[in-house]
Amino acid sequence: MARGGRGRRLGLALGLLLALVLAPRVLRAKPTVRKERVVRPDSELGERPPEDNQSFQYDHEAFLGKEDSKTFDQLTPDESKERLGKIVDRIDNDGDGFVTTEELKTWIKRVQKRYIFDNVAKVWKDYDRDKDDKISWEEYKQATYGYYLGNPAEFHDSSDHHTFKKMLPRDERRFKAADLNGDLTATREEFTAFLHPEEFEHMKEIVVLETLEDIDKNGDGFVDQDEYIADMFSHEENGPEPDWVLSEREQFNEFRDLNKDGKLDKDEIRHWILPQDYDHAQAEARHLVYESDKNKDEKLTKEEILENWNMFVGSQATNYGEDLTKNHDEL
């Protein structure tokens, strides 16, 4: 989640690859299946009932995606349970032998925050070229677009020309929004806001604006129903729409289009992708407690958690299983 020219073809390849990684809201291939825009990692958690307690495919895929859901397979069941037990002791803040929904929510939020800052740390050195522990806009621009800017002829007749031409001003606009003191240089906190704008209150207008720009194909400043559907689903000519598409059309009319004018403005887009009444960590914590609470006392013992260990290994409570492969002292 370094670009630039280290050799002609290698530089181009790295630039394109990292452009895809670090500007996910800009480059989007047309999907053939449903795509979720709502800014929350477990997009549909709480919107449809989980599978039975014998299968956690829904949990893993909702939290991770299909590929990352296999992370927990790195350890044997006994190793997973042993390490999960140590994590449970840390989640139980008051040491009363129970894990409450609130304690789980606090832990999940901590894991989320750590994941974001770890992600920034991994790419920091690629952009901080003068090693002053700050990243200027010029450093970022050269690392990201240097090859493109230095070799425009190679891109002139390609789709990449349009892509980079669109990305550069958008990245600059987002960088300036994250740069709170306006010095065109990002601290780690500011660069984190640049890479993960959905996590910062002062960046949410940028998230809304970029979403509008991505979906609004006719350029009228609104998202109509067809644009809303086209962002989620690539329709085959004369082909039938899946049932979920029909359901999304109903969602658009009944819940997205608040003023019933047939289109979404910025406020309605904000309400859609940044719902104020949804706490992702709270929803997941409640889900984990509900699925593991055998005696229905609305809190979990270590035994209840370990009995349902494979659900927790695949959830954000263990950073999708990654915490189980770390030394306990790292947590």
Curated annotation (Swiss-Prot):
PTM info: O-glycosylated. O-mannosylated by POMT1 and POMT2 and elongated by POMGNT1.
UniProt keyword annotation of Protease present: no
Signal peptide: 1-29
Annotated positions binding Ca(2+) 3: D179, N181, D183, T185, E190
Primary location class: endoplasmic reticulum
InterPro entries membership: EF-hand-dom_pair (IPR011992), EF_Hand_1_Ca_BS (IPR018247), EF_hand_dom (IPR002048), Rcn1 (IPR027241)
Motif Prevents secretion from ER, residue range(s) on this chain: 328-331
General remark: This protein has four functional calcium-binding sites; potential sites II and VI have lost affinity for calcium.
Name the UniProt record assigns to this protein: Reticulocalbin-1
Organism per entry: Homo sapiens (Human)
Upper taxonomic lineage: Eukaryota, Metazoa, Chordata, Craniata, Vertebrata
